[in-house]
A protein has these predicted regions:
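Beta1/beta-strand and adjacent pyrophosphate-binding region of the FAD-binding site
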Residues: 1
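Nucleotide-activated chemistry modules centered on ATP-dependent adenylation/adenylyltransferase
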Residues: 4-280
Length: 280
């Protein structure tokens, strides 16, 4: 993703282990063209031999998001499973790429705290059997500060102003981990969110659906529902819509708490649910 954990992983494997590192970013709709370009530049600075963007946004929408809209899916009536729904598509894309280049190992930046590590590991075991799985952050129980110190020591400096938070950004929302999220009595401050609430006052938003898929926003038709989702996200995020914290169970037997901002999913699912009341 180009975040702290994966940046550390690229540099450490290239510099300390002498690996030939192929950096791959599986984009599920959360990166702009500028961000992807920056990811590429950073990957080479960190020591990667090659960098590639694997765009799985279309596959993610076609095989997951549209079905979550059909089903008005909210985990515990709260969380639109923004991250967990996209991980399998990221993992499959990485596994396919690893097989394509004949990689002997696949590294990912998951910690030992939640379900993501299981999603990645199991997918790689199934789709790339025999390939070694490397998880430096998890296996070394590394702190974020330790990773920053290592990168700085080796001449790599980046904007880690939100050091205590870990983000995952996709078409169906952004997750925020760390900081206040680790304390069940606290919520996230405004500065923790990537998209800031800047608008006040009412605004009328009209969403149009065809066979369960979002096809128009405020009267403007979109052939591609992905584009329509992005428009709704921009409108809703400016009001701070879709912010919350979710507490769920993990397969490793502990509770997990995650903050999120998901304006588009909350608005789209809410509108679709009420539309069904009138039409079904």
């Amino acid at each position: 993703s180009g975040g702290l954990d994966t940046s550390y992983t690229v540099m450490y494997l290239a510099k300390e282990k002498g690996y030939e590192v192929y950096a791959a970013c599986a984009n599920t709709g959360g990166f702009s063209a500028e961000q992807l370009k920056q990811n590429e530049e950073n990957a080479y600075k960190l020591g990667a031999k090659e960098y590639v963007t694997l765009d799985v946004t279309r596959e993610y929408y076609d095989k997951s998001i549209r079905y979550m809209v059909y089903g008005n899916v909210l985990r515990n009536n709260c969380y639109p499973i923004s991250v967990s729904s996209e991980r399998i598509f990221q993992a499959m894309a990485i596994a396919r790429y690893a097989n394509e280049i004949g990689a002997s190992a696949i590294a990912h930046g998951s910690t030992g705290a939640g379900n993501d590590q299981i999603r990645f590991d199991m997918t790689f075991l199934v789709m790339a059997p025999g390939v070694e799985i490397i998880t430096l952050t998890r296996d070394g129980n590394l702190t974020r500060q330790e990773e920053v110190d290592y990168l700085n020591k080796n001449g790599y400096f980046a904007d880690f102003t939100k050091l205590k938070y870990s983000y995952n950004v996709g078409l169906w929302g952004t997750s925020i981990c760390g900081g206040e999220i680790l304390d069940s009595t606290q919520g996230l401050p405004e500065c923790a969110y990537l998209k800031h609430a800047t608008k006040e006052g009412p605004e009328l938003l009209k969403l149009g659906f065809e066979k369960g898929e979002l096809k128009s926003v405020n009267g403007k038709k979109y052939e591609d529902p992905i584009e329509a989702i992005q428009v709704v996200e921009e409108i809703g995020a400016a009001y701070g819509i879709g912010r919350d914290c979710h507490v769920g169970d993990t397969i490793i037997g502990i509770k997990g708490r995650v903050g999120f901002e998901a304006a588009a999913p909350m608005l789209i699912i809410g509108a679709h649910r009420f539309l069904e009341k009138y039409t079904l």
